[in-house]
Amino acid sequence: MREAGYDIRVIPADIDETPFDDEAPLTLVERLARAKAAAVAAEHAEPNELTVAADTIVTFDGKILGKPADEDEARAMLRELSGRTHQVATGVCIVKAADNAAPHAAESLSFVDVTDVTFYELSDEEIERYVASGEPMDKAGAYGIQGTGGRMLVHDISGDFYNVVGLPIARVVRAIQKLL
């Protein structure tokens, strides 16, 4: 966002991110983005200030692939994604604080951006080398497209690259312009 010309503060939101029973992945990411934005705006927003919150998940065959708990789970996720297409979904919520700094938003806007990502067919050796690098261990779906090793996994992408990184910047900037 700084590269887009915005002065930002990063403030983590302390919310419960547990999915509801039978909650669809896209519904989940939008709900979490809204909850994060509301929590941060209520606590920290100044008059007319914007709060941008996001949550990103990786989904495959309708199930959410979170961060791997250990190397075995990372290997299993990478094998599952090997040669296949999965989705990266980011829910975004932008809240414009009221001009009197009331905790309630004067306006808000939210959306979900989805990008299809297709992996190359991965050999066991490639998976082992990538897992051994440690790179997949703190990433949803056990990979980071922006990482050194992660770049080597992706065969094709349909949608916004920056959505896969974690924030669809161009769409966020356009949404901000609507609120200003």
Model-derived regions: residue spans:
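Short beta->alpha connector loops at strand-helix junctions that form conserved
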Residues: 11-17
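Anionic-ligand binding patches
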Residues: 25-180
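N-terminal G-site helix/loop of the GST-like fold
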Residues: 1-11, 179
